[in-house]
Structures are given as structure tokens and as C-alpha cells.
């Protein structure tokens, strides 16, 4: 091409611009001039003479860059350390700008040069600008290496000034350290930074904080020291994140943890109990945060666990009498302790599962072995009964019921939280079931929705099987409404009228803990009841063929109007037996015990409680104050002077017989009932296991049985053995006849 310029001509066009870039940057480079130079270089490289350009240009550029580096070095000698660092930073920033502009202008040359340098290597430096690389090398060899020690000392002084509270220019730190990284070889860009700065920085950091920490904790104590450490770690972390390569953070953190925390971890832990007692949540957060960095939380967990027990016991012992007598007091104390430390775990220990486990362990001991509910002689706790009574109180009508739905749900949720700590969940369930029965059949439940809510909460925690009977009880009560409506429709169709208003509960056998007591003679309902019972029995048998009704008179209730001499009418809430006794007074002013026995059919023991309760209420009177002296001729009369502030009077009250108070419906489940239920559960578990496994050794069967029933209770080995022997007698399982006793197994008999 006739218009192609030579290499010398091209250099003559570019030389002054290149010199200005490095030696007179303030002169600037216009966009127009930039494009002129770039176009000429590009056009030349597009011709056949590009190799000549490379051979000519690269050495000249290297010389120019080296000249600039020498100039910077010579000027730097006149600056002291602090001023030198600023000078170096400014020259480095200008150098970067000049190098980048030069790199872009010579990019066509670089592309050719890079293509000539290609090898089979896939390393990242294949395509690096040779021009930019040369400028970095010149800077490193001529300007950086002679000054690096002075620069590093100045940089470390900046950090020391920052640590000790003197004002300083941290941006200089960032820019200078960027230079350290940029000058590193491509294979390890951090090599120069690590060898020339980082290593010394970490050593000085360790030295600085060893001295400061020892002095500070001695003068200010642990709590102030923790706050100081917390702030120091935050400052150091922020400085690294903002001004240094992130790789330094892990190394720095290790030093800080060791010097500031590990060296004083025992002093931290020894102060933990005082902080707990003083309830300084901010200090708890700091101590947990700091000691978790050095994996020294075990002493804290142990102290925390012991503290929960001591605080709970202190609270219970200060209210011991009330806690023993009133379920709501003991449960409220336990819930208060649970809530307090559960919140502490969330807010101070980041929901740490190890602290939660420690709390569960100590709180379980507090729940089950507290002095208000634990009997050390029997080694038993009645907390399952107490918790069931607490639930009964808030779910039934009365002063303890919570009408606010949100608050009620909160209390039920808290009750289930305590429930999970019960080892004998079967005792809770048996008592809860019995109390639910009473609430439902006596119309004492405040809300069906609340009852269902509690059952669902238990179901969610313990499983569907645990609550099967409870669910069935609620279902029965719903069905009873339909049955009574249908019965009334039946009476209307037959033009029949009952002498009194009746409501019948038809309950599924097996789901309810309701059975009549065994008596020598059966109860004979009074005529006022008998016709209604007969009508309903006839209706039910026709509607539900094959079903058998058993009337539970022990649990039947009645409202009886009592008209006094002055015309005042009281509504008496009575048991069926009390109602039968009171109705006898409609025909006589006095009746003997013999007449009562003969009329209602019960023996003298069975009528004792109903009579004593009526006497205690003041409805009737007896000439013989002590029931021990009663005989067949003992007379009972209506108290014509009876009066009460309440128009509705409950006659089913507890009375003192011997050393205990009794009522017609025992509130809690007896030990015999518990043992009977457990024996049944053990049998059922063993049969299920053997039906599945077919053959098992005694030890394996014992272990598997324990596992299956453990969600209800922890069985005794003797109880399991007794259940096995019973099932052998009933021919559900049998022993093999192996000659070696240790090899004998149990076999399932289909």
C-alpha cells in the first residue's frame, strides 16, 4: 500500500503522547488525540508489517516506563515516612491511570503479541496485556522494591494510630495495599502482600492485643472487658473487610480469638453465674458470642442448667403451701420459669440447640422432682395429675376459665410445653380423660372449640393414637345432640309427654372412663325417672338395633327445685341418688335409712356419701351427727330453715370420711386403675411385637416392648415379665423347648 507509514513515522506520531502519559500526566489527553493515535496503531497492525511494529515498539515503551519509575524513585528520597506514603499512593494512582491508557492505545499490538506467545497452557496470564505487565514490572523493580520496607512501616503505623484513637487516613491504607496485590505474580497475586505486609501486620496485632488485654481486664473487670473485646473484634473485622484482602480475615480472627478470648475464657465462665443472677441480657449475649468463637460453651451450659433448677426451686419453695394445694399456682410457677429461660435462649444464645438441651434436662428434673409435687419416699411425682387439673380448671366453666381466645390458646400451648416433660404421660391422659368426662356429661365445659383445640395440640405432639379416646368423646357429645332431637321428635309423633325434662348422653363403651360401682343391690330409679328411661330405651333399640344400653346412674345428674316455707325456691344440682332420696320427702316429713335402702335399692354403704353431702349442704338433717352410729332406724328430715345466698346450690360436694375427703365422683385416677391400664398396654404391645416378629428372645422382647410403650410410661422389667407370663397362660405366646436356657425364645401362637 502506497500510503503505508513506516515504524519510525508511527513512533514519531506517538512518542510525545506516550511521554506525556507518564512524565506530564497533568497535561491530559484529549479524546480526539486518543482516537488519532489508536487509529494509526490499529491501521498499522492491520498491514503486513505488524511484526516489525512489535519488535520496535515494545522496547521503546519499556524504556519510557523505566524512565518514569526512576524519576519517581529519585523524588521519593526527599519525603519522610508519612509524606512518602501519600506521595507513593498518589504516584501509584497516576501510574495505574497512565498504564491503563497506554494498554488501551496499544491493544492492537498486544493482541498480536499475545497470539505469538500462545502455548498449550490454559493459565489466565496468556491474554494479559504485555504492555500492562511491563509497566507493573517496572514499577515493582524501580519504585516499589526499594521503598517497600518504609511503606510497610508507615502502613502499620496508620493501623496503630487507628487502634489507639488518633485520626488517620485509612483510604491511603486501602490504595497502598491494592498496589501490593497488583504487583504480585499472576500465579499468586497475594505473594508480595503476604510477605511484605500481612505477616508483620499479624505479628504486631498479636503483640498489641496481648499487652492491651492484660492491662484492660485488670483495671476494668470481666464485663467491661467483654464489651471492649466485642468492640475491638468488630473494629478489626471492619478494617479488614474495607481495606485489606479478605483472605487476611481468617488469620486475623484466629489471633484475636486466641489473644482476646481464649486467654481469659476461664475468667469469663467464672463470671457467668453473676451475670445470670443480675439478669444482664446484653452481657449474656456478649459472653455467649465471644466464647462460642473459641468453642468454650460447655461450662456455660452446665452453669445455666444448674441455675434453672435453683431458680425454679427457689420460686416453688417460697410459695410451697399454695403450690401444693392449688394446681394453677405450681403450673404458673413452672410456666414462668420455662418462659423466662426459653426467651433467654432465643434472645441471648441464638436458639443454640445445646443450651435448649441443657434447659430440657434441668427443667425436666424441676417439673418432676420439685418439692410441691414429688414424694421422695415413694419416689413418685403427681405432676401429671396437677397438670391435668390445671387444664381442667381453664377449660371448665368457673373463675379460672379464660374467655379470651388468644390467651386461652397461649395457656393451652404452655400446658403442652410442660406435658412434653412428663415421663408418665399415661397418668396425665387417664386423669385428663376422667376430668373431660366430667366436664362433658355435667355440662361444665366452657367451650367445645377449646376442648378440641387442646386435643389437637396433644395429638400434634404425642400422635393420633394418644388422643383417640378423647376425640371419640367429643364426637359422642355431638352425636348426642342429634339423638335427643330425634327422641323428642319420636315422642311428638307418638303424642307422648315426659313428666320431667330429660337429656340423655349415649356414650361409646371403651372411650369413656365411666363405670358404675359394684353394689350389693342395683339402683331402683324413682317412678319420676322410670317412665322416661323406658321410653328412651324403647326408642333407642328400634333406632339402633343390636346396641345395648347400660345406664350409668353413678354419673347421672339432676336439677331439683326445693320450695321452702317462705315460698323461696332453690335449684339444687344433685346426683341421681341424691335426687331419688329428696323425692321421697315429697310424701313424708321423716324417712329412715331402712326406707331409703328399700326404696332406691342401694345398700347402706352406697347411700352414705349422698346422704352426708345433703346434710353438709344443709338440705336435710339427721338426728345422729356421726354416720358411724347410723342404723336402719336412723331418721332424716328436710331442713325447713334452709337458706343460701345462692339460688343454685350444688349438693355433690366432698365430705370427710375418715382421714380423706370423698365425693360420689372421684376426681383423680387411682393407682389400681393406672396399673390396670399399664398392664393392658404392655399386653397389647407384646402381642403386636410377637405377631410381627414371630419369634424373639426375652431380652429383645423386653427392649422392644419398652420402646413401644415409652411414649406412655417407662415400664418396670417385672411388669413386662408379668405381662409375658399372663400371655403365655392365655396362649398368645409360648416358650421354645430348647435344651439351652439362654437360647430359648418366645413364639407367637396364631
UniProtKB/Swiss-Prot annotation:
The keyword Ubl conjugation applies. InterPro entries: Cullin, Cullin_homology, Cullin_homology_sf, Cullin_N, Cullin_neddylation_domain, Cullin_repeat-like_dom_sf, WH-like_DNA-bd_sf, WH_DNA-bd_sf. Neddylated; which enhances the ubiquitination activity of SCF-like complex. Keywords: Isopeptide bond, Ubl conjugation, Ubl conjugation pathway. Pfam families: Cullin, Cullin_Nedd8. Pathway: Protein modification; protein ubiquitination. SMART domains: CULLIN (SM00182), Cullin_Nedd8 (SM00884). Residues 678-739 form the Cullin neddylation domain. One of its GO terms (biological process) is ubiquitin-dependent protein catabolic process. There is a cross-link at residue 691 (Glycyl lysine isopeptide (Lys-Gly) (interchain with G-Cter in NEDD8)). One of its GO terms (molecular function) is ubiquitin protein ligase binding. One of its GO terms (cellular component) is cullin-RING ubiquitin ligase complex. Probable core component of cullin-based SCF-like E3 ubiquitin-protein ligase complexes which mediate the ubiquitination and subsequent proteasomal degradation of target proteins. The E3 ubiquitin-protein ligase activity of the complex is dependent on the neddylation of the cullin subunit. Belongs to the cullin family. This is Cullin-5. The lineage of its organism: Eukaryota, Amoebozoa, Evosea, Eumycetozoa, Dictyostelia.
Amino acid at each position: 500500500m502506497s500510503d503505508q507509514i513506516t515504524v519510525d513515522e508511527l513512533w514519531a506520531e506517538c512518542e510525545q503522547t506516550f511521554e506525556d502519559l507518564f512524565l506530564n500526566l497533568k497535561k491530559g489527553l484529549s479524546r480526539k488525540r486518543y482516537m488519532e493515535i489508536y487509529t494509526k496503531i490499529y491501521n498499522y497492525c492491520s498491514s503486513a508489517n505488524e511484526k516489525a511494529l512489535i519488535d520496535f515498539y515494545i522496547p521503546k515503551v519499556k524504556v519510557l516506563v523505566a524512565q518514569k519509575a526512576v524519576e519517581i524513585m529519585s523524588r521519593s528520597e526527599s519525603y519522610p515516612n508519612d509524606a512518602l506514603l501519600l506521595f507513593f499512593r498518589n504516584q501509584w494512582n497516576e501510574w495505574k491511570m497512565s498504564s491503563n491508557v497506554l494498554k488501551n492505545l496499544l491493544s492492537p499490538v498486544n493482541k498480536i503479541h499475545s497470539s505469538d506467545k500462545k502455548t498449550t497452557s490454559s493459565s489466565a496470564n496468556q491474554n494479559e496485556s504485555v504492555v500492562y505487565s511491563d509497566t507493573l514490572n517496572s514499577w515493582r523493580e524501580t519504585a516499589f522494591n526499594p521503598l517497600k520496607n518504609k511503606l510497610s512501616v508507615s502502613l502499620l503505623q496508620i493501623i496503630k494510630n487507628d487502634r489507639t484513637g488518633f485520626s488517620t487516613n485509612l483510604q491511603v491504607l486501602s490504595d497502598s495495599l491494592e498496589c501490593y496485590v497488583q504487583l504480585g505474580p499472576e500465579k499468586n497475586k497475594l505473594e508480595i502482600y503476604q510477605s511484605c505486609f500481612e505477616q508483620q501486620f499479624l505479628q504486631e496485632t498479636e503483640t498489641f492485643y496481648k499487652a492491651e488485654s492484660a492491662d484492660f481486664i485488670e483495671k476494668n473487670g470481666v464485663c467491661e472487658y467483654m464489651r471492649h473485646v466485642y468492640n475491638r473484634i468488630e473494629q478489626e473485622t471492619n478494617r479488614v473487610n474495607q481495606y485489606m484482602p479478605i483472605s487476611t480475615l481468617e488469620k486475623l480472627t484466629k489471633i484475636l480469638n486466641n489473644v482476646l478470648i481464649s486467654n481469659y475464657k476461664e475468667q469469663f465462665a467464672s463470671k457467668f453465674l453473676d451475670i445470670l443472677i443480675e439478669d444482664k441480657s446484653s452481657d449474656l449475649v456478649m459472653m455467649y458470642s465471644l466464647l462460642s468463637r473459641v468453642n468454650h460453651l460447655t461450662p456455660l451450659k452446665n452453669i445455666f442448667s444448674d441455675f434453672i433448677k435453683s431458680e425454679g426451686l427457689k420460686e416453688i419453695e417460697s410459695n410451697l403451701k399454695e403450690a401444693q394445694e392449688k394446681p394453677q399456682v405450681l403450673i404458673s410457677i413452672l410456666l414462668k420459669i420455662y418462659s423466662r429461660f426459653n426467651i433467654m435462649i432465643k434472645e441471648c444464645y441464638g436458639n443454640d440447640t445445646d443450651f435448649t438441651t441443657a434447659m430440657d434436662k434441668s427443667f425436666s428434673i424441676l417439673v418432676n422432682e420439685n418439692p410441691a409435687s414429688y414424694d421422695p419416699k415413694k419416689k413418685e411425682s403427681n405432676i401429671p395429675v396437677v397438670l391435668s387439673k390445671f387444664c381442667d380448671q381453664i377449660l371448665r366453666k368457673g373463675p379460672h376459665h379464660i374467655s379470651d381466645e388468644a390467651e386461652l390458646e397461649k395457656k393451652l400451648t404452655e400446658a403442652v410445653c410442660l406435658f412434653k416433660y412428663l415421663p408418665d404421660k399415661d397418668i396425665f391422659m387417664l386423669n385428663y380423660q376422667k376430668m373431660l368426662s366430667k366436664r362433658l356429661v355435667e355440662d361444665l365445659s366452657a367451650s367445645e372449640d377449646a376442648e378440641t383445640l387442646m386435643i389437637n395440640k396433644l395429638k400434634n405432639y404425642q400422635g393420633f393414637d394418644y388422643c383417640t379416646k378423647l376425640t371419640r368423646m367429643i364426637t359422642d357429645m355431638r352425636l348426642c345432640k342429634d339423638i335427643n332431637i330425634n327422641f323428642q321428635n319420636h315422642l311428638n309423633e307418638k303424642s307422648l309427654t315426659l313428666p320431667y325434662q330429660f337429656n340423655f348422653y349415649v356414650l361409646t363403651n371403651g372411650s369413656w372412663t365411666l363405670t358404675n360401682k359394684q353394689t350389693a343391690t342395683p339402683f331402683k330409679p324413682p317412678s319420676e325417672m322410670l317412665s322416661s328411661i323406658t321410653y328412651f330405651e324403647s326408642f333407642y333399640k328400634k333406632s339402633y338395633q343390636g346396641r345395648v344400653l347400660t345406664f350409668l346412674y353413678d354419673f347421672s345428674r339432676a336439677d331439683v327445685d326445693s320450695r321452702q316455707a317462705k315460698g323461696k325456691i332453690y335449684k339444687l344440682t344433685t346426683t341421681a341418688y341424691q335426687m331419688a332420696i329428696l323425692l321421697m320427702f315429697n310424701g313424708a316429713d321423716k324417712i329412715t335409712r331402712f326406707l331409703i335402702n328399700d326404696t332406691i335399692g342401694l345398700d347402706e354403704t352406697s347411700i352414705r356419701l349422698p346422704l352426708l353431702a345433703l346434710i353438709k349442704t344443709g338440705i336435710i338433717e339427721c338426728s345422729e351427727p356421726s354416720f358411724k352410729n347410723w342404723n336402719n332406724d336412723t331418721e332424716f328430715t328436710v331442713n325447713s330453715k334452709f337458706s343460701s345466698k345462692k339460688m343454685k346450690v350444688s349438693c355433690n360436694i366432698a365430705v370427710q370420711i375418715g382421714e380423706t375427703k370423698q365425693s360420689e365422683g372421684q376426681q383423680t385416677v387411682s393407682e389400681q386403675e393406672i396399673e390396670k391400664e399399664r398392664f393392658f398396654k404392655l399386653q397389647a404391645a407384646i402381642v403386636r411385637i410377637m405377631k410381627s416378629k414371630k419369634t424373639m428372645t426375652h431380652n429383645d422382647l423386653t427392649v422392644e416392648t419398652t420402646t413401644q410403650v415409652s411414649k406412655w410410661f417407662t415400664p418396670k422389667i417385672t411388669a413386662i415379665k408379668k405381662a409375658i407370663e399372663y400371655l403365655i397362660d392365655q396362649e398368645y405366646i409360648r416358650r421354645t423347648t430348647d435344651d439351652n436356657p439362654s437360647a430359648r425364645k418366645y413364639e407367637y401362637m396364631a
